[in-house]
Structures are given as structure tokens and as C-alpha cells.
Swiss-Prot record:
SMART domains: NDK (SM00562). This is Nucleoside diphosphate kinase. It is found in: Cytoplasm. CDD domains: NDPk_I (cd04413). Keywords: ATP-binding, Cytoplasm, Kinase, Magnesium, Metal-binding, Nucleotide metabolism, Nucleotide-binding, Phosphoprotein, Transferase. HAMAP family: NDP_kinase. It comes from the Archaea. GO terms for cellular component: cytoplasm.
Amino acid sequence: MSIQRTFVMIKPDGVRRNLIGEIISRFEKRGLKIIGLKMVKIDRPTAERLYEEHKGKSFFEELISYITSGPVVCMVIEGDEAVSVVRKMIGNTDPKEAPPGTIRGDYALSKAENVIHASDSEEKAKREMSIFFKEEELVTPLAQVHM
């Protein structure tokens, strides 16, 4: 058993379409814990930090414009093998390749409006979490606190 933390963000289309509760519910039903949660409007410099690996690619400007177009919900999720479990749950970036039952398979409209972002490695998770959360903002669920 390897307890990990990962970063997840419900993108503007997911927020706009009122999918926040449904998405969070899927993670909780899978036994994952939400230990950090906030709704924010991302500014351009923050978006560029988050997606720095895509800088210079043809879709970069469209991605930055989209991710700054409305509020997003940022989460830190903790659980056994959280990075890979969450990646499986969200499905392929292209909704045509995402199986039904995955978040993108069920809700994504296109490659651009694909509802959700999740870190694809522990290293990226640490970097992405640090953009949006301070360590002291993360909360251990009460069920895990020993009294």
C-alpha cells in the first residue's frame, strides 16, 4: 500500500456545467480522501506555471485562454496509489478515447473542454499542488486522526 497525494482540477467547463459534486462523489466513492479544496479564478501567470510543459506548442495559447475563462475547482486527493487511480478514473484526454464510466468518457465535450486535469506523476503532483496549496492548508480527514 502506497499512500500518495495528487492534484486534481475541475476545469471551467466542468464548473459551468455543475459537475463539481458528481466528480467529487466519484473520488470519495472510490475511497479517496479530499484533503484540500478551493474554487479559484486562475490568472495568466498561474496558468502558464501550471502548463509550462506545453509552452511553445501550437495549442498553448488556446489552453491558457480556456483555463483562465472561468472559475476552476482545485483539489488535493489522498489515497492508495492516488496518482494512477485518479488517472484511470478520469480517462483519456480525448473523450473519443475515454471509456464510458470514466469522468471524461461520461462528461467531456472535446479535447479542449475535457472537464478535468489531474497530475500524471508524483513529481508533477507535488509541483502542481504547490502552485495552489500551502502545506498547512491540507487537512487530514478526521477518521484518520488518532485521539
